[in-house]
């Protein structure tokens, strides 16, 4: 007989990456395979992510549900003895709204586990063979969003963050691209490279490399309003700087000669 996986005694929040099932972590894949109930954000996760689910598992879409409805289902299924997983696109710690769900579940004395996932900025950068941290250019990556209906802390305005001239990954910002471009051009040269990704790693997704001065125009032409990421970085296409890591004249713990 094959090995029978032990039922989880916790609810798992699982990051499933931006869309490609091959980018699932081994742990995420294992959790999906043993789940009795899979609660997933169908507006942000392609259905093929569920291809590895076991036969007979219950799959519940959440795009039309509010917080209380989602958590009520999770509690009900878990208390009925089911193995419950909650799927989130990308990595749950980034703009995932998991805190409020977890608080409700913990109030019911339910143990929680969070499984990290690959984020869209990593995949988009990989598609363009881009390194976002280059010595003497930038060693900092900022993951943020343009202010919209959800407020931003006063000290985290895009203008304040752009002053660092580091690599900036803009999530949830396609509707505010005009204002974002205007702000970024105050601190970055117009020719700064920008990776634009739409539904990154989905079957119909794509990425493009453009210049900052064209970010608004390009977004309008492509009718981008959601599921879009912008990576603005002075490091992209900058091949003039060399890392010390593999420099023969640089000594470190594992290479002292």
What are these regions (language model features)?
Residues 45, 120, 176:
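Short phosphate-engaging motifs
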Residues 2-115, 123, 216, 228:
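Class I S-adenosyl-L-methionine
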Residues 42, 63, 116-118, 147, ...:
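Residues at the C-termini of beta-strands that transition into short coil/loop
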Residues 20, 91-164, 208-211:
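Class I SAM-dependent methyltransferase SAM-binding "motif I" and its flanking Rossmann-like core
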Residues 11-13, 69, 80-84, 140, ...:
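A contiguous loop/helix-start segment that scaffolds small-molecule binding in enzyme catalytic cores
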Residues 4-5, 29, 51, 76, ...:
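Short secondary-structure boundary/capping segments
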């Amino acid at each position: 007989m094959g090995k029978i996986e032990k039922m989880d005694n916790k609810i798992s929040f699982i990051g499933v990456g931006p869309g490609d099932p091959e980018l699932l972590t081994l742990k995420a894949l294992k959790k999906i395979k043993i789940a009795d109930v899979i609660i997933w954000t169908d507006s942000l996760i392609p259905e093929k992510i569920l291809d590895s689910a076991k036969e007979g598992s219950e799959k519940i879409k959440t795009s039309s549900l509010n917080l209380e409805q989602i958590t009520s289902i999770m509690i009900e299924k878990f208390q009925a003895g089911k193995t419950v997983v909650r799927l989130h696109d990308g990595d749950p710690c980034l703009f995932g709204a998991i805190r409020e769900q977890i608080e409700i579940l913990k109030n019911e004395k339910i143990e929680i586990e969070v499984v990290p996932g690959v984020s869209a900025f990593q995949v988009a950068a990989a598609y363009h063979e881009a390194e976002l941290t280059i010595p003497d250019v930038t060693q900092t990556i900022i993951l943020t969003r343009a202010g919209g209906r959800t407020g931003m802390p006063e000290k985290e305005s895009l203008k304040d963050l752009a002053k660092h001239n580091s690599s900036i990954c803009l999530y949830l910002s396609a509707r505010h691209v005009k204002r974002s471009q205007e702000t970024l051009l105050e601190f970055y040269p117009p020719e700064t490279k920008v990776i634009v990704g739409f539904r990154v790693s989905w079957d119909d997704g794509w990425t493009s490399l453009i210049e900052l001065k064209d970010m608004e125009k390009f977004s309008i032409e492509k009718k981008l309003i959601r599921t879009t990421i912008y990576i603005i970085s002075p490091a992209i296409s900058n091949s003039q700087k060399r890392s010390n890591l593999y420099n023969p004249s640089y000594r470190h713990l594992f290479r002292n000669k």
